[in-house]
């Protein structure tokens, strides 16, 4: 079951959430109830969320509540299901790999020649590939975009350079490494195999938005766990309020 809770920015949503978590903790282990509760938050928010949990739950520790990021949950599930055989490459490793690729492909680039030593360009390319993958834009989708642009258009030439870099990057990691975005996709496809997930009640908080990959994870968790609860920030008077 999926439950959505939303409120205005000025409301104490953490207080509400931890009160609901407290109620669920009281039912841990009862027939039909979860055995544990996982609170999923953004990577950079895990420490603050733990502090908030100690404060709102008024306890020195908790056994049945675990606060973790989606990437950490992915690692747990893939370790359990045996889906993490390839070496994980993070954004820093991808930065180095992209720098190597851009230098090697310099003669084949039209617009971005000589950019292999530019940290800002490599960072931009790193972030762009990450976003393309998060939004399920693969090489074929990127090629379709390029085909819609007029010949000799500067934007088209830029896209063709990005396509070449993206293609070489995929070739370099294929079968050897797995990046964060593909790691998350692999996680989503293994959730149904996890005996860990089926006994967990999930709470999700602290996210401003969800990428398609994250939405797929939420769908799989909803189908295969004791339930998913999402806490959102929304102004009920906003033009988008009706989607909730």
Language model feature labels by segment:
Residues 1-5, 13, 104-206, 213, ...:
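Accessory N-terminal region flanking or inserted into the helicase ATPase core
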Residues 32-36, 197-200, 225-227:
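A general structural motif
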